[in-house]
């Protein structure tokens, strides 16, 4: 029986996942993080992108998060995210369209242009698309 740690993923709307996992893989501020049982305590912000849970027995679940925080304690991993979507529920065509729209918005700068908001939309659309593509590559979906 594999060693596990309790993991909670909570969005602004609801608890998305609560259960035992062998590992959590997420995209932190300084790069990808692999959290396994016994990991040192940690708090970090999470960038938009995929978060992968390796559950007991090796089964995997992938979610898209739009950003948030990760807290690691000796017997618990908690993800507090702004928005969480099961990766399988993401629409690749819609993500590509959002990416194109965000790129176009960045090109059409006017006097009232909010660069940081446009850049944030671009980063989120790119992260959604990356999540869909990783899921397809990993699981042949």
From Swiss-Prot:
It comes from the Bacteria. It is a peripheral membrane protein. One of its GO terms (molecular function) is ATP binding. SUPFAM superfamilies: Epsilon subunit of F1F0-ATP synthase C-terminal domain, Epsilon subunit of F1F0-ATP synthase N-terminal domain. Disulfide bonds: none annotated. It holds the Pfam family ATP-synt_DE. GO terms for biological process: proton motive force-driven ATP synthesis. Keywords: ATP synthesis, Cell inner membrane, Cell membrane, CF(1), Hydrogen ion transport, Ion transport, Membrane, Transport. Its main location: membrane. The keyword Coiled coil does not apply. One of its GO terms (cellular component) is proton-transporting ATP synthase complex. Belongs to the ATPase epsilon chain family. F-type ATPases have 2 components, CF(1) - the catalytic core - and CF(0) - the membrane proton channel. CF(1) has five subunits: alpha(3), beta(3), gamma(1), delta(1), epsilon(1). CF(0) has three main subunits: a, b and c. NCBIfam families: ATP_synt_epsi (TIGR01216), PRK00571.1-4 (NF001847). This is ATP synthase epsilon chain. The gene is atpC.
